[in-house]
Amino acid sequence: MTLTPMEDKGIIPNFNDFKRQLAELLQSRSTVEDITLLQGFLQLVHSKTQQWRGAEGLPATPDLLDAVWKEIHYPIFKWFQQWRAHLLEAAEGGPQERTYISFRRMNGKLNKIFKIIRQFYNGLVQQLFDRYDFGKLLPAGVIRELNVQSGGELQTLDDSSYFTILCVMSLQRCLLYLGCCHRYKCCCSKLSKRFHISDFDDSMRYFMLAKQIVPSVGETYLQEGLVYVQTGNYGHAAYAFMRGSLSRMPTDAGIPNLESIVADASSGLFAKHQGILKRLRSKESDSNKLINREVLEFYFLALFSSVYAPESWSKQGSDIRHCTEILFEKVRSRYARNVRLILQDVLLFIGGFDLVIKKAKAMGLNRSDTLPSNCTAFLETAFDFFSHVIDSVVLKEWQSFDTWEYLALVRVICVWIKSHSIVTQFAHRHTQFCQSVAHLLNNILAHTEYQQLMDVEHRPKRDYFFQEDIMLKDFSAIGHTLSDFNDVDLFQMENLPDRLAGLVDDKLTAKEEGLLKLHAIVFIGKKFLANNDVNIVWCDESKRFNSLKPDVPLRTCSPPKAKTPPPSTSDYTPAGAKQTKKSKPKRNSRRVQSLSSLEAKLMERKGLRQSVAEGRVYSGCSVPAAPMSFDVAPSAHLYQDRAAGTSATQEAATYYNQGYNGPMQLGSTEILNSRSPSGNNRIAFHPSHQAYMQMIQTPQPQAWPTAYGHNAYYSQPTQHPYPMSSQLAQFQNGPIPFVAGPYAMYMPPPGPGMVVLNNGHPMIPNESPPQQHYP
């Protein structure tokens, strides 16, 4: 096989020969008996790969690494995963002693193959550091964590060149695939089906390093989410999938995986989440058995799911209202050891709204000036939760500076409101949230130690990123960074990579950092309350925000532009039965004639939620055995029902990644108070197959391209099986079918023409790149 350098003809190595040889090996009984055949094959592939050199002698480019993983390493790991599944199936009806012996033999062969693959990626990492100086691009702490030895004269990488992008992205790929290798090894090396997060410490370490180097790649979050799926932590998995789909370089598999947990009732993960909720409900009578962390993870996920995909959850057999009450009580009483999880819940609401808006846009519901009622219900639930968190957690602990999450909760919420016009308009009309923010600011300004914050007129400055800023790098729902600080001077300082990682010698104390954060919170909070629509105003005499009184007339606004949609003609009873509304709507009607009546209903929203929540019900933990055929890639979503046709989560992958050209205008005051969609305005979260066919373009045949360019990246996970013959692989305990699906890494088109690295600089190449146009 001939490997042509990229700079000569722009052709990447063709792995067709290797793919054919691998298919023959994996379907041969001799490979099972003698693993040295597979070892020799891997050594040959690695040797040929390392002989190829990219631009300026780069050991490997990101595309070359993607090809090696997709065509060689990933099918091998899936082969071992299938072997393990076969042994587990045989163990159910056969002698246990024979199963253990077979498993030890399989595990020994897996360890030999794993060492060869790990050595390949570690060797490439060492080669990169042997040739190039990453000091201007990576934090010193990350380089120390990699434990690489640099020697001799190194080429300094310029953070404005295209070649630097290739070097950094190649390093990121090596770390990402090292994490994937450790994940598959852990999954295959245990005979038990139960896993703990500590089993994947090595995988999570490499994923964390990959995020620190290039935080904008969503694939890293996707792989973290797959780890959490394996351990049964579906709340953490949902957050990771959301982050992966809302990164600057998103993965198209994030949304389908998320919906497998929270929206697709036919998914195995959805059913497992329901089972966990039923198990927790049975433990509520005994407080000693009910684990607070499980409530904050799984009960919150049920609340989030009920407004993210109400059509899927309205048919379940449990009460969301009861679940919400238990959740709110645990937030109020058990937040101290779970504040990081509460912050994650807040972020899931923030990211989830972006996904709901994208879904509404894809369904063509942004053509009017009215915010869809599904989006309104989502915001209402989210801000109820935010208000409760501020009142029950932040108001008590805002001076506990040693725990950075308390002030981070307020910073994240306020920045999100400021960066999204739809959310801003809604938040200005949410009475309880405005009151919560006003009470928090009053408490801060009433403290004698912080009197100087009363007259702040500018955002504060700082010399390095704080922990929450590092955590939320390239999170598109908040504008890719927390913007409540003025960081213009920061980006001009020396040792910028270390500063953006929070690794500086002259680091402030926790209290000094807290004072800067309070400055930012007071500034952005006063800006927010200056335009509220619930009549909370600043009093110059008392230097406080006044308290909202029900008898104070509310500020009026212009009437909505769009026509008021008709009220729903039907609703659900607590049992799920459909009933026809008989007469004129009563106090809980969703028709609002003026802003004053809207605010009155917002003040009574607890009563409103009581009537509507009765119609919302929910009801889900271990990981199933490996599938009997591999017709999905690791980036693809889980638990597709092939026999039933295309699943809802599979259909959702296409329209979620459509461009989002900005938020819609909120023009209707009637729709703001609507807790659930009416019959005529409900968003179909699982539209019909015909409706999807009108939105989804016909997929093109996917094959590894012969040249660099836009076609060099897969726009979606491949649905075509790995080309292998139909011969059955022979195992010691009998034949077992094998079809491996290729791995497809989604890389979006380089629209902005830049990659943001960990040093914060947008990488806009000054030179004309080779034929490859890498984002």
UniProtKB/Swiss-Prot annotation:
Annotated Gene3D superfamilies: Tetratricopeptide repeat domain (1.25.40.10)
Subcellular location: Nucleus; Chromosome, Telomere
One GO MF term: telomeric DNA binding
Signal peptide: none
Biased composition (Basic residues): 579-590
UniProt KW Repeat keyword: no
InterPro entries: DNA/RNA-bd_Est1-type, Est1-like_N, Est1/Ebs1-like, TPR-like_helical_dom_sf
One BP annotation, GO: nuclear-transcribed mRNA catabolic process, nonsense-mediated decay
Region entry Disordered, spans: 550-597
Its biological purpose: Involved in telomere maintenance.
Descriptive protein name: Protein EBS1
Organism: Eremothecium gossypii (strain ATCC 10895 / CBS 109.51 / FGSC 9923 / NRRL Y-1056) (Yeast)
Phylogenetic classification of the source organism: Eukaryota, Fungi, Dikarya, Ascomycota, Saccharomycotina
Gene that this polypeptide is encoded by: EBS1
